[in-house]
Amino acid sequence: MKCTSVLPNLLVGSDPRLKDEFEELKSRKVTAILSLQTDEDRGEGGIEGERTAAREAGLAFSSVPVEDFNRADLRISLPVSVAELDRLLKQGHTVYVHCTAGVNRSPTVVAAYLHWCLGVELLQALIHLHACRDCLPDAEAILGARSSDATEPHTP
């Protein structure tokens, strides 16, 4: 698991799979996980397996499944994903946002959060994420979601 701090209360990276990785998140003061993976991404046990592992580690868990390598699904899911991230942060959590590799979906959600919720210029949000970790946040998905009327949340 590769985990990178973006803000003191916001981390991004790849999916935790092992008990030690959930414990590492706790040692980094993470109190909540936002997973963008689908059941197919997780494999055996699916999202519920991760939810159980997070709970066993004492971490809150939220899931907004986003299909990997699907810009349209990412664009449609961004408003819901960002709203869930914002909700967790406003509750005082330190949040770990992850997808499978931590390269596209999770950095895109974090960049959109920085831009939409914190007012960071999109280019600056992207530059900041690139400085934090090797990743490819999807600026086109963010720009498309901003003007879309997609408001229906995905069901976990």
Regions found by a protein language model. Give the residues of each.
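A phosphate-binding catalytic loop at a beta-strand-loop-alpha-helix junction
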Residues: G92-A111
